[in-house]
Structure formats: C-alpha cells, structure tokens
C-alpha cells in the first residue's frame, strides 16, 4: 500500500496510525534507547557480509575460527548468509579440552545442523607453554600454540575471527584485515591504514591475515542480532540462581557474573545500565596489565 496516496480514506489513515502505535508498543524499549533498530542491524550485517565475501574472493585458503561463544556463532550465521546457506571454508576449533560440557554439546549438535566442515585440533599441554606467563595467561597461551600448529598443518593464508573492538582495549587497536608475521605474531605498531572499506588483503610472504568481520559490532549488537535472527545460544549465557556467563572460555579460568537476566531481552536491558566489563569473568583479564597484549602479539585472538 502507498502510505502517501492522496485518495486514502480518513478511516484508512486512522487504522494505519493505530497499527503503527501498536508496533511501537511491541518494540522493546531497550532497542529504541540503544538505537538497535532493524536498519542498524541490517547495516552491520551488510558490512560483515561484504568483509566475508572480500576475504573469500581475495585469499586462497580460509578458515573460520569457531570458539563456540556468542560472537563466533553470529559469525557462522553471517557466513551462511554471505554464501547462500553454506559455509564454503572449514570451521576450525582449536580445542584446549577444557571447555564447558554445554559448549561441546552445542558444537556437536550445530556442526551437523549447519553442515560445517569442522576441523578440531588439540592444543599442546601446559608444560609446553612459557612458564614466565601468569597462570591464566599461560593456560590461554595453549590456544596460541595450538593455532600455530594448525596453521602449519593446513597452510591457511586467512583466518576469520570473531573479535570486537569494544570487548577489550588491545583488540580496539586491531584492523579488519590484520597481517600476521611468519610465526603468527601481531605487530601492534605496524598496521595498515583502512579507509572507506579499502582493505589490504594480501598476506605477507609465508604468513597469513586475520580477518575480523564483526570488529565494528558491540556486545549489545551481538545480542540484538541473535534475538532478531533467533540464533541458537549456549544456555550458560542466561542467568540461573543469580549468576550467568557474559563471556565463555575454558571452564577453569572463566567465572560467572552476578545477574538475573534469564532471556536475551533481559540481557539487553542489563547491558544498558551495567558498569561491569564484559570480560570481568575471565581470569586472564585480572592478571598483569600487559599479559593479554603479550598473548596477542604472540598470535592469540
């Protein structure tokens, strides 16, 4: 119907106005307050799909890192949208063997349902990791070393990762197409400029690129999109007995936060007022100030 038609009846206009008011009442207040409208989420989605397709067109051998958390599940969803229902490159899970049972159950179920070409590579034991790192950072570094082994095994020239600038200060320094050295390291002081969606998608000789399609998203964006698209989630994100997980990692170095948010709607309301950092439950983020950056420089996500 043409809403601007001159021959619409007064009665018809009244019905449209009433319908509009009804739709406004159904729109969650939190979505309006944060500006998480359909248009906003569509713009985020379109930009991310563009990045996926750009990476696929310009790199020879890609993989999507799947950590099983809310961000990487959105990444799988976006990849399926970008390529018409299927992910045309492997999903790579670098497994520490210490994830929550709910995470492994989720992985097994949705690998089948989403038709993923899943590669699971185990991390080296803690004894093989730099003993000078603080305990949680040393545990997390197993993933860095496991990723290096997977790169050497498969020869990927591009790894797609679901990091966001808003979740941690070191990640705020990242680029969408981020070059890594021959050992997988990241030089935070030497990064290519990125203007107007013009990306340098040429990996250094013998090295690879990290591609970050949701770098520009926020935690609230992730949850609003998950709600809109009805993306499956791991139940640990929802509050039980006054606690929930905002960020999921290894069970031995990840703790829940105080929360009564037992639905995505309640999570969005909580995020609108909380002063608690997203990664407050990660033991790694409470160790030495430079521990996380040391890990990222060495190749951590």
Indicate residue ranges for each PLM-predicted region.
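Nucleotide-activated chemistry modules centered on ATP-dependent adenylation/adenylyltransferase
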Residues: 2-301
């Amino acid at each position: 119907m043409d809403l601007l038609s001159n021959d619409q009846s007064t009665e018809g206009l009244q019905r449209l106005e009433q319908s509009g008011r009804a739709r406004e009442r159904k729109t969650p207040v939190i979505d309006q307050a944060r500006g998480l409208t359909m248009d906003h989420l569509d713009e985020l989605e379109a930009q991310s799909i563009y990045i996926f397709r750009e990476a696929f067109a310009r790199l020879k051998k890609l993989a999507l890192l799947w950590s099983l958390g809310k961000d990487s599940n959105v990444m799988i969803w976006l990849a399926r949208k970008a390529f018409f229902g299927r992910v045309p490159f492997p999903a790579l899970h670098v497994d520490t063997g210490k994830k929550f049972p709910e995470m492994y159950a989720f992985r097994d179920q949705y690998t089948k349902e989403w038709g993923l070409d899943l590669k699971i590579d185990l991390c080296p034991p803690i004894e093989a990791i730099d003993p000078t790192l603080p305990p949680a950072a040393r545990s997390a570094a197993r993933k860095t070393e496991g990723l290096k082994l997977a790169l050497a095994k498969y020869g990927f020239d591009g790894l797609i990762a679901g990091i966001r600038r808003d979740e941690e200060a070191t990640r705020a320094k990242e680029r969408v197409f981020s070059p890594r050295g021959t050992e997988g390291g990241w030089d935070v002081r030497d990064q290519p400029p990125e203007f107007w969606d013009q990306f340098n998608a040429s990996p250094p000789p013998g090295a690879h690129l990290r591609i970050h399609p949701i770098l520009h998203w926020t935690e609230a964006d992730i949850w609003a999109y998950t709600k809109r698209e009805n993306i499956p989630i791991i139940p640990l994100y929802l509050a039980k007995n006054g606690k929930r997980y905002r960020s999921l990692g290894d069970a031995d170095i990840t703790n829940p936060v105080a929360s009564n948010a037992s639905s995505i709607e309640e999570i969005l309301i909580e995020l609108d007022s909380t002063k608690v950092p997203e990664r407050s439950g990660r033991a790694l983020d409470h160790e030495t100030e430079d521990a996380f950056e040391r890990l990222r420089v060495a190749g951590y996500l």
